[in-house]
Amino acid sequence: MRRLTLFVLMVFAGTAAGRAQGTSQGTSQGTSQGTSDSDVTAKIVAMEHMWSQAYVLKDPKALERILDDNFVNVESDGKLMNKADMMAEVRASTILQVLTESMVVNLHGDTAIVTGIFLMKGVERGKPFAQRERFLDTWFCKDGQWVTIAGLVTPVGE
């Protein structure tokens, strides 16, 4: 089984208390009109957290609500994954913990760009692993609901 990569949080709004904070830059307008930047940021951070927890809890239904039907992710090995691929990956997850750091939410009207770093730990083929990656997620407010339309993960050093 291939090493699971989470872009998240994966990921990545933080599974540890106090790590589920993101900073906000930019302005929110359009369909998110009437909602403050901090409210939008908090909502997106919460959904990022839900996304990373989906891997720990093996809960693909969480991704059903978060990922757009046309979602695309570029994995750290260059592989492209769609929504169905991501949901299958969650069902087979061996991830035990996901932590995030340096998460920033940039708001641009009905679009939000989220960047950060996540560390995931788990067991693969009976051996423990730890993986640290930078992520970039693109969120879009579609019909009044924020969904992720694209993601990218890339390895980073310790």
Task: Please report, for each region that a protein language model flagged, where it lies by residue.
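Hydrophobic h-region of N-terminal signal peptides that target proteins for export
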Residues: M10-G18
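A beta-strand edge to alpha-helix "cap/lid" segment located at domain peripheries
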Residues: Q21-E158
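Hydrophobic transmembrane signal anchors and adjacent membrane-proximal interface regions, especially
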Residues: F7-M10, L80
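Bacterial N-terminal signal peptides that target proteins for export
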Residues: M1-L6
